[in-house]
Amino acid sequence: MFKNEQNFSSYFLLSAILSISILQGELVFPGNGILINYIHVLFEWEQESEAEHYEIQISESSNFTSTVVQADKQTLVYIEKDALDWDKTYYWRIRPVNNNGISGTWTDSYSFSTGSPLSESNTTFSNPSDIQNGITVFGAFFNYFSAAIDQSGKEIWNSGSENIV
């Protein structure tokens, strides 16, 4: 198979590089540079070898000098429902932590932007004890959009530029 030692060395080095790049996890969602029309955001990443859990950071600055979210997760997903807002650009990254508590290196960061809210709805609660968990989805026929609000009346999703009612 190998005609000389140099071919074997080249093959071995290439195999090692490919193995390392395949084993290192990658950020999956939200994808780099995308615009989303919701502020309850699912973050997903690929598994990294020997990771017991992951640290995730979300920041408004690309150098992560301050973070809006810093969390530890034992899964490959994280849902942020409170800290993100409309009309902002965010950066996110993860790093694995092994069972000895040793942190790996941070992944390259991805950025994403949140669109603008479309609803001008206001919520008034006459009896706060009647509030139930969940979301309310509605359509606005005059402006041709759909949106969802959470139990506190905060818009968390909209149809963006799509005219769906």
Explain the meaning of each model-derived region.
Residues 97-165:
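Histidine-/acidic-rich catalytic cores in large beta-rich domains
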Residues 24-49, 86, 108-119:
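Pro/Thr/Ser/Gly-rich low-complexity, intrinsically disordered linker/stalk tracts
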Residues 48-52, 141-143:
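Short proline/glycine-enriched turn/loop motifs at strand-loop junctions of beta-rich domains
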Residues 11-21:
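Bacterial N-terminal signal peptides
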Residues 2-12:
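Bacterial N-terminal signal peptides that target proteins for export
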Residues 53-87, 99-110:
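Recognizes extended acidic, P/S/T-rich segments that occur
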